[in-house]
Amino acid sequence: MANKKLAFQDIILTLQGFWSKQGANLMQAYDNEVGAGTMSPYTFLRSNGPEPWGAAYVQPSRRPADGRYGENPNRLFQHHQFQVVLKPSPKNIQELYLQSLAALGIDALEHDIRFVEDNWENPSMGCAGIGWEVWIDGQECTQFTYFQQVGGIEVDSVTSEITYGLERIATVIQEVDSVYDLEWGNGVAYGDIFKEPEYEHSKFAFEESNQELLLKLFGEYEQEALDLLDKGLVHPAYDYILKSSHTFNLLDARGAVSVTERAGYMHRVRTMARKVAKTFIEERAKLGFPLLKDEALREKYLGKKGKYTKIVEGEEK
């Protein structure tokens, strides 16, 4: 462990510097409610298709059912993920991850770091992959995944995703038991910034949300997303899919949907997710997959017998 314990904001800056040197583009948090960094278009959309891609970004992640009124030391309505996606996956990705921990002052020789097999899936978004939870000193701090399917579509090129739970990483580094005792930066505590919002969002999610309004909004967001997809407007449509997903999560936290209804709502979100993923690939194919520079791969996907040639030629919809 380094002598000076990194503040929360310095952890972010350190990870940004590390992954930028590994070829990741430093993106900003997506400006829509999401439950995980995976749901940002910088991961969800870009993981499909054959184009190479690298991104790293902080993503505030809202999970209404996990709210605990600011009273639980490590369970939150909103937490922060540091998301890294590299496509195609580097062969030494696990070693790079361990190097990133070392950059944070977490020495593998001084800490108990374990990769625990945990094949990951997000059923509502049609995502799945093989992977591991990474436990540091007895608590899960990172999810490590090789994507196999995104939006219900088998990927062309395997994307490696590393999702750091920033609050948990920070409690290891700063050696505190409660996230609210973390130093965010410049002497300001995490609790000074986020404890009151945690209480208010929890009260809203569990007690005060308007169920009738949320049910209406889900249907309207869903219809808007489908209408936009029919017009080929992928990115606005995806925004409304994210709104639909978050609205469902609010309904679920409020106990407003039965077990049977829950499965139905998840199916509706998954249907939209599959359609937007497919439409995004078609959009990129028609543009000629501009980020794909490897000629052999261009031939494989866009050549005479290429996988996406019919889409480009307008023979497939």
Curated annotation (Swiss-Prot):
Q: Which domain of life is it from?
A: Bacteria
Q: Is the keyword Protein biosynthesis assigned to this protein?
A: yes
Keywords, sorted A to Z: Aminoacyl-tRNA synthetase, ATP-binding, Cytoplasm, Ligase, Nucleotide-binding, Protein biosynthesis
Return the GO cellular component terms, semicolon-separated. Answer: cytosol
**Catalyses which reaction?**
tRNA(Gly) + glycine + ATP = glycyl-tRNA(Gly) + AMP + diphosphate
Q: Could you state one GO biological process linked to this protein?
A: glycyl-tRNA aminoacylation
What EC numbers are recorded for this enzyme? 6.1.1.14
In terms of SUPFAM superfamilies, this protein maps to: Class II aaRS and biotin synthetases
Give one GO term, molecular function aspect.
Answer: ATP binding
- Record's keyword annotation contains Cytoplasm: yes
Q: Where found, per UniProt?
A: Cytoplasm
Give the main localization category. Answer: cytoplasm
Q: Which Gene3D superfamilies match?
A: Bira Bifunctional Protein, Domain 2 (3.30.930.10), Class II aaRS and biotin synthetases, domain 2 (1.20.58.180)
Q: Which Pfam families match?
A: tRNA-synt_2e
The residue range of the signal peptide is: none
What is the similarity comment for this entry?
Belongs to the class-II aminoacyl-tRNA synthetase family.
- Assembly and interaction partners: Tetramer of two alpha and two beta subunits.
Q: What is this protein called?
A: Glycine--tRNA ligase alpha subunit
Q: Which organism is it from?
A: Lactococcus lactis subsp. cremoris (strain SK11)
Name of encoding gene? glyQ
